[in-house]
């Protein structure tokens, strides 16, 4: 595993302090990963050590005590962390999505997510309460009820799913639909753990990515006062800075985790074939079929890494991609996940039967990588977006 290079991707036009996950910390995180997986436990010690190392502040401006990293550099950190512990990278990455969303909003002249940056600067852990059962519209509609309190605040009632960091968050984003006015509005706000009326079910027992503890969440009329309501948007797709900031950071930081998983699978395969010797005494690494397979895997990961890096840099540099933004973001995420799953599966085939042991790291990666298909945007959703971008909407 190598440290992330964070010399690029810092806040444009501002000072930045390069930040890396130190090798000794990476090693401890990697050592704990099998135990968290086996026990289906939250990565609490990883969070404690990363918080102490400044990880929760890497995207916070230097003036507020952070490192000022942009999306490109944060993606590199996530890729490195995922090589040590995919579930830790995925779960804690939800915090980084909010930090980078706030950065994108700020870079585009808005300040409504300043409280997100302020809380991250105080080392508070941010989580997402967005996904809902059966809601394929994700940010563009909600089955959660947002009831106005008459003073600018709201009470939220509904069910959220895949709430990563459930045991540990300090601040949870919520959104729901207010249907009391002439037109329905989607209301976004933030809940503090001390607010109460938020219930997490102990129902996270999954094939992989177990240390995220992404539990089902019940909102029992939780009250969010006016000063923690950040946006009210129309139902349906829109280009609001909140939507863009969250969408860009989510898709690319998710993609980065799965690129890191693929990188680790290649490293494990290379190590395994380097130690194996055929019956005739020749090293397995000299087998032309093995060499061709690993060459193909290396090329596939190089290609998707370049795509993620280029698009993250475009976000940092505020490139004007217009209507191309969303097709590029969903396509890159979908390709990253598909590539990672292919790479892990092929790495297992190249390594052979030892990879099939439940104790093998590759076997754990094979389970973890399959979570990628369940994060928005799915392959089918991405395909619909891409088709619409070239053919227009269906009749």
Could you say what each language-model-derived stretch is?
Residues 161-166, 250-253, 372-375:
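Glycine-rich phosphate/pyrophosphate-binding beta-alpha loops
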Residues 30, 34-37, 302-335, 348-356:
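C-terminal helix-coil-helix/basic helical segment that borders enzyme active sites and/or dimer interfaces
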Residues 353-395:
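Glycine-rich phosphate/cofactor-binding loops in nucleotide/flavin-utilizing enzymes
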Residues 260, 295-302, 330, 334-341, ...:
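Generic structural signal for well-ordered, non-transmembrane alpha-helical segments
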Residues 206-301:
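Glycine-rich beta->alpha junctions and the first turn(s) of the following alpha-helix
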Residues 159-200:
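A short core secondary-structure module
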Residues 3, 7-11, 15:
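Asp/Glu-rich intrinsically disordered low-complexity tracts
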Residues 44-51, 58-159, 164:
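Glycine-rich flavin
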């Amino acid at each position: 595993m190598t440290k992330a290079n964070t010399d690029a991707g810092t806040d444009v036009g501002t000072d930045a302090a390069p930040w890396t996950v130190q090798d000794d910390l990476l090693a401890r995180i990697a050592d704990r990963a099998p135990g968290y997986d086996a026990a289906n436990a939250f990565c609490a010690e990883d969070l404690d050590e990363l918080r102490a190392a400044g990880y929760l502040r890497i995207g916070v401006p230097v003036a507020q005590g952070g490192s000022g990293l942009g999306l490109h550099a944060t993606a590199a950190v996530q890729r490195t962390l995922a090589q040590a512990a995919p579930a830790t990278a995925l779960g804690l990455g939800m915090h980084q999505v909010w930090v980078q969303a706030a950065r994108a909003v700020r870079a585009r002249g808005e300040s409504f997510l300043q409280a997100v940056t302020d809380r991250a600067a105080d080392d508070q852990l941010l989580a997402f309460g967005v996904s809902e059962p059966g809601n394929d519209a994700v940010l563009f509609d909600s089955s959660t009820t947002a009831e106005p309190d008459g003073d600018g605040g709201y009470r939220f009632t509904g069910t959220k799913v895949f709430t990563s960091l459930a045991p540990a968050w300090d601040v949870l984003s919520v959104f729901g639909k207010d249907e009391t006015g002439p037109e329905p509005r989607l209301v976004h706000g933030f809940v503090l753990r001390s607010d109460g009326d938020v219930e997490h079910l102990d129902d996270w027992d999954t094939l992989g990515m177990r240390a995220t503890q992404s539990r089902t969440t019940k909102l029992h009329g939780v009250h969010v006062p006016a000063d923690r309501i950040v946006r009210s948007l129309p139902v349906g797709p829109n280009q609001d800075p909140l939507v863009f900031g969250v969408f860009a950071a989510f898709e690319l930081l998710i993609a980065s985790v799965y690129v890191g998983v693929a990188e680790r699978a290649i490293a494990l395969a290379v190590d395994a074939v380097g130690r194996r010797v055929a019956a005739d005494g020749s090293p397995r690494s000299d087998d032309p079929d093995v060499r061709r397979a690993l060459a193909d895997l290396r090329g596939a990961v190089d290609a998707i890494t370049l795509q993620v890096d280029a698009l993250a840099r475009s976000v940092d540099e505020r490139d004007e991609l217009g209507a191309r933004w969303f097709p590029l973001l969903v396509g890159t995420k979908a390709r990253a996940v598909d590539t990672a799953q292919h790479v892990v599966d092929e790495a297992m085939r190249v390594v052979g039967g030892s990879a099939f042991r439940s104790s093998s790291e590759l076997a754990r990666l094979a389970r973890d990588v399959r979570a990628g298909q369940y994060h928005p945007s799915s392959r089918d959703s991405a395909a619909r977006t891409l088709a619409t971008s070239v053919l227009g909407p269906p009749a």
